[in-house]
Amino acid sequence: MLEEGRFLLERIRKKSLLLILLIFFLVSFESNDKNIDKISNFLNNFKTISANFIQLDNNGNPTTGNIKIKRPGKMRIEYNKPVSNLIISDGIKVALINKKSSSINLYSLNQIPIKVLLSNDFSLENYQVINYKEVNNIIEIEITSKKDKELGSITFIFEHRPMQIKKWIINEINGSKTEIFLSDVFINKKLDNNFFRIIDPRKIPFGRKE
């Protein structure tokens, strides 16, 4: 009789533990879903981003500069000296300009992973969530395009309260990655369209600066 009682208590204890674990996971999933919705809303609703950045390449080498994004499709990434590169998207094409050598290379907007930030109709339905984790006030989410997986993936790091983008990582399919740490972030600050004009440096008169 005593053994039956112990067996019954053990079954109740196990069921209680399973119930607690089930409730914990359900609450966790609900919390994750809510936070993913907040991230999706942020990525879908902002109009402009302006920030300073520190960029680390695959070898950990740092460069600094300023980034401006204006939806739809416009972006300007200007590096501080001694780097002379300037990247501009005018909404149709992307130009990589070397101000020192006055060279320019043009690419399609669809060829860059960061296009997720430039789209005016961002939807997580078009992306696969590869990884999601939440530690304290930091949320990290990695996504990849369902259609353009050859572009690799992009990882966003957010502060949760209040929701604020802090960093992103571009993960290329060859294994290399580029990390962008943001500071002095301004959301929906008015940005003049002239920032996003692509001017061929070879056509600028000598001595004139753009």
Q: Where in the sequence are the language-model features?
A:
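Gly/Pro-enriched, hydrophobic low-complexity segments
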Residues: 125-208
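Short hydrophobic/aromatic-rich beta-strand segments that constitute the beta-sheet cores
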Residues: 51-53, 75-79, 94-97, 141, ...
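An acidic-aromatic
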Residues: 66-116, 178
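Sec-dependent signal peptide recognition
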Residues: 13-22
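A short, Trp-centered hydrophobic/proline-enriched beta-strand micro-motif
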Residues: 41-60, 68
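N-terminal secretory signal peptides that target proteins for export/translocation
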Residues: 1-13
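Cleaved targeting-peptide boundary
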Residues: 30-37
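Hydrophobic h-region of N-terminal signal peptides that target proteins for export
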Residues: 21-30
